[in-house]
A protein has these predicted regions:
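A short, conserved acidic/glycine-rich loop-to-beta-strand motif
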Residues: 1-2, 6-7
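Conserved nucleotide-sugar donor-binding catalytic segment
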Residues: 10-102
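Positions in alpha-helical segments
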Residues: 56, 134-135
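Catalytic core of nucleotide-sugar-dependent glycosyltransferases
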Residues: 85-93, 98-124, 146-156
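Charged/polar low-complexity intrinsically disordered segments, enriched in acidic residues
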Residues: 122, 137-138, 142
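Membrane-interface aromatic/basic loop that binds lipid-linked glycans or pyrophosphate carriers
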Residues: 140-170
């Protein structure tokens, strides 16, 4: 990924010089479902998949959320991550993740998407709900809306980082 002032390396390292990492069935799916920062990097522009999966559609309700597509793509499947940059991304102008309408759509559509998996993966969905709320709380903190920030942070995982956000939101 390349920004205006610095280059950020977002490529995983292969431990055995093969140049790729292999992930077991559902390993990437569960990592994405729980919004974990550990696991396969799945940047939208660099996901390569077999043509037999082209029937998996992007959501059309909001027209901008890829979370459900990623979940469907990796559910019950093995995957491979190429450990080299497939493209450089230039970031200019406005940042979509700071757009309130995008964040609101992402929040509600993420909850809708994970509800599909609630019966089969209850603890993972519960963890995902907390992380989605934490993300929304940190967004409102960054935007300066401390009341809304606290509302969502209180629904997230209570850990030191969350407590510090809550304390400094008053």
């Amino acid at each position: 990924e390349k920004s205006l002032l610095k280059e950020v390396d977002r490529v995983s390292k292969s431990v055995d010089e093969k140049g790729y990492l292999e992930y077991e069935k559902n390993e990437t799916f569960l990592s994405k479902l729980t919004k974990s920062k550990v696991g396969q990097q799945t940047y939208l522009g660099s996901i390569l998949f077999h043509s037999s999966l082209k029937h998996i559609s992007f959501e059309e309700e909001c027209g901008m959320i890829d979370f459900d597509w990623v979940l469907k793509l990796f559910h019950n499947r093995n995957s491979v991550e190429v450990c080299s940059a497939l493209y450089l991304r230039k970031v200019e102008g406005s940042n979509l993740s700071l757009n309130e309408q995008y964040r609101t759509n992402d929040y509600y559509y993420s909850f809708k998407s994970i509800s599909t998996y609630k019966n089969k993966y209850p603890s993972e969905v519960k963890r995902s709900e907390k992380r989605i709320n934490g993300s929304m709380g940190r967004y409102y903190y960054l935007m300066g809306d401390m009341r809304l920030s606290r509302k969502y942070l209180l629904k997230s995982t209570i850990e030191l980082k969350t407590i510090l956000y809550l304390i400094t939101s008053f």
